[in-house]
Structure formats: structure tokens, C-alpha cells
Amino acid sequence: MNSQTSVVGVHYRVGRKIGEGSFGVIFDGMNLLNNQLIAIKFEPKKSEAPQLRDEYRTYKLLVGNAGIPNVYYFGQEGLHNILVIDLLGPSLEDLFEWCGRRFSVKTVAMTAKQMLSRVQTIHEKNLVYRDIKPDNFLIGRPSSRNANMVYMVDFGMAKYYRDPKTKQHIPYSERKSLSGTARYMSINTHLGREQSRRDDLESLGHVFMYFLRGSLPWQGLKAANNKHKYEKISEKKQSTSISELCAGFPNEFSKYMTYVRSLEFDEEPDYAFLQELFDDVLRANGDTNDGVYDWMLLNDGKGWESSSSHFSVVAMKRRKNYLGLNVVQNDDSRKKNSTLQTQNMRFKSSYGVRGPRNYSSFDALPSKNAPLVRQEQSASKKTIYAHSSRGYDRVRPMYVSQPSNNAVGVNHPNDNSDSEAKGGFFDMICCRCFS
């Protein structure tokens, strides 16, 4: 193959296809100037709802903060917009699966402190995230300096909750379109109320209990369509008391949920108080925040990285419609495609929507980079369960090594399943070794 056909942005070599989503395709790759491993996202320029330029802008707001990946380049290549971003490790959802779909109290408390810090950072930048879920939190690449740092990715749903200059909070409103993932979204979001900081924190609490319990009481509900399913999930969340949700686990988790659900729409959360709750969990449990997580103890203490030839990961293959809703396949189809042998891959992880997990070697030849065709819209926009006409008021991420032509960016010094009312860009990203 001609090397020129697999180099984009002047010096980024495109490797293998590692994921795809509603809006494009992802490849791994390498920066030819410094041999740094990267991920490259491709988006058709004629996409009805292009996201990569906005994604760049969001990362520009957040750059320099712990747990926010670096993004190096945004530009155009042929029929596509491309974005070059740090190659990270697996998502917390992946690690959760590999740990038998249950985390220890210690791991949940330590992970909660990191996740809470990331959300606080976003809030301090005047944004609410609006799609908290385990898939959107990744750890660092194995053997890297920050291998067990929790990173936050996929800011396609983020929105300003206050004016960056005046700090004036947006007004309270109702009858809003759903945005986020039904399993984890707040009760107020289900009720069509404008989201604010309190909703991100409530969603975090649902994720914490998911990690502790293995599942949430509102998972697995059956309904004729997504609208009715969201309604059932909402009803079950409202009827499940906090004491029932948190039964059998340290009382601090109940205190967390009680506090975040009691916040007013425009109230500033006491993040220090919430952090202290998880410190209390560790102390009461006789643990310390030593950075030793459950996934590091797999394979007789060798860690998840050494599990590539030993683990079979159960993965549900989903198809996505125009609205970005992940529709679970029927049971027969799921069984047929349920087991993914990891012998030929280091790991998998998710930048947003979890999708097909059929990894293959794929070079970024122009002939193979045809624009993706999104499926036809099948849901009405007339209810709060449909995509808003403004595309969820997206704001977005990114960084650049050297702008050229239409490229934008700045120089960087370094370097069970519930339907989702969400349109994320990509499904998965994995670290792979170059031969």
C-alpha cells in the first residue's frame, strides 16, 4: 500500500479500524513525528449533524485539567472531517464486565472520587455534561504514567448552564427533550425538566449504585417501544426509595443520593462534602485511597492488561437509528454474537455509544472511507422523548499539532441494556500495538 494513502493531517499514520458510531468511524494510529499512539475519528463532511469541530471547541475549554484527554488536530481529508485525540484505555463499563459485573466498595469509592472531580471540572467551566454513564469514563493507556487515571470523553451532549462571563444561570424550564442515557439519567430529566449540575450528580449516583449492585432496579423493563420504556424506567426510579436503592451498602451512598436529589435547580453543589463522603467510606471500610483498583488484581495480580488471551467478554451488539438510540437485538441474535474472544486485541473501550464489537484490521484507504449513511428517522419529534431540533445544543472538543489548510486547533506541548436518547460519535477505541 502506498504510504501516502494512510497518512492524514500531514504526519498522522492511520492504522486499523477500531470502532464506529452514528456519526463516523474511528481508527488507531501514530504520530510519525514522535511515535505517539493516537486515535483518529472520521466524520463525513456532508453529515446532517457534524460534530467534530464543536468537539474541538469543547476540549479547548477543558484542556489542561486532569482526566481530560488531549486532542491534537482537526481538519479535512477528502470527504471527511478528522479529529486526532489521545489513545486511551478501556472504559469503566469494560472493566466492570471483566471484574464479573461487580466492583468492591473500595474500588467504587476511589473511582467515585475521580469521577466526581471530572464532573466538578466541567461544571467549573460552566458546562453540564448531560450524559453520565460508565462508557464515557475511560482509564489511561496501559503502562502509561496515568494508566489508572479516570478520563472523561464524548462531550456531544454538553451544554452551558450559565453565562461564562456573567455567571448568570439559565432559567428553569420544562417540556425539554430527553438527553442522556435512560438507565442513569436523573428523575428530573425523565420529567422533561431542564438539566443543571444536580442532574449530572444524580446520574453519577446511579452509576455508583450500578457498580455496587451489579444492576439497577429499573433495568430489564419490557415495553413496546422506546417511549414507553423510558416512561417505565422513570416510574420505577420514582417508586424506588433511596433506602431501597442503597440497601446493604455503606450509608454514605444513601447520603450522597439524598443530598444530590435535594439540590435546587440553580444551587451550587458542595463538591467537598461529597468527596468527604467517599473518604468516609474508605476509612470505615479500613481502606485507603491507594490507587489499587479491582481490575489491577485480575489474573493473580497481573492486572487486566494480561488478560487478552484468557477473557471472553460478553458483548451485546446494538444497532443505532437516526436518533442515536441503541436498540437491543433480540435474544437469538444476541446469543449468536454474544461472545467476543479477546485473544487478538489488547482491550476495548468506549468513547460514548457502545456499539458493534467486531474488530478488524482496516487501513484508511480513500476507497474504504465512503461517507456513512445514517438510518432514517423513525421517532416523532413531538414528544420529550425525541431528539430536539437543535441537536441537544451541542458544544464540543480538541487540539492540534500544526494547523494546515482548513485545520484548526492549537499547538499542544505534550504529546442488559437500556436504550439511549443520545447521539454520540463513536463506539469504541482500543489501544493496539504497532508492528
Curated annotation (Swiss-Prot):
Residue span(s) of domain Protein kinase: 12-282
InterPro entries: CK1_Ser-Thr_kinase, Kinase-like_dom_sf, Prot_kinase_dom, Protein_kinase_ATP_BS, Ser/Thr_kinase_AS
GO biological process, one term: endocytosis
Reactions catalysed, as given in the entry: L-seryl-[protein] + ATP = O-phospho-L-seryl-[protein] + ADP + H(+); L-threonyl-[protein] + ATP = O-phospho-L-threonyl-[protein] + ADP + H(+)
Modified residues (Phosphoserine): 361
Record-level GO cellular component terms: cytoplasm; fungal-type vacuole membrane; nucleus
Record GO terms (molecular function): ATP binding; protein serine kinase activity; protein serine/threonine kinase activity
SMART domains: S_TKc (SM00220)
Chief site of localization: cytoplasm
Main EC class the enzyme belongs to: transferase
Active site, per annotation: 131 (proton acceptor)
Pfam families hit by this protein: Pkinase
EC number annotated for this UniProt entry: 2.7.11.1
Localization (cell): Cytoplasm
Highest taxon of the lineage: Eukaryota
Keywords associated with the record: ATP-binding, Cytoplasm, Kinase, Nucleotide-binding, Phosphoprotein, Serine/threonine-protein kinase, Transferase
Biological role: Casein kinases are operationally defined by their preferential utilization of acidic proteins such as caseins as substrates. May contribute to the regulation of morphology.
PANTHER family for this protein: CASEIN KINASE-RELATED (PTHR11909)
Family: Belongs to the protein kinase superfamily. CK1 Ser/Thr protein kinase family. Casein kinase I subfamily.
Protein name, as recorded: Casein kinase I homolog 2
Organism name: Schizosaccharomyces pombe (strain 972 / ATCC 24843) (Fission yeast)
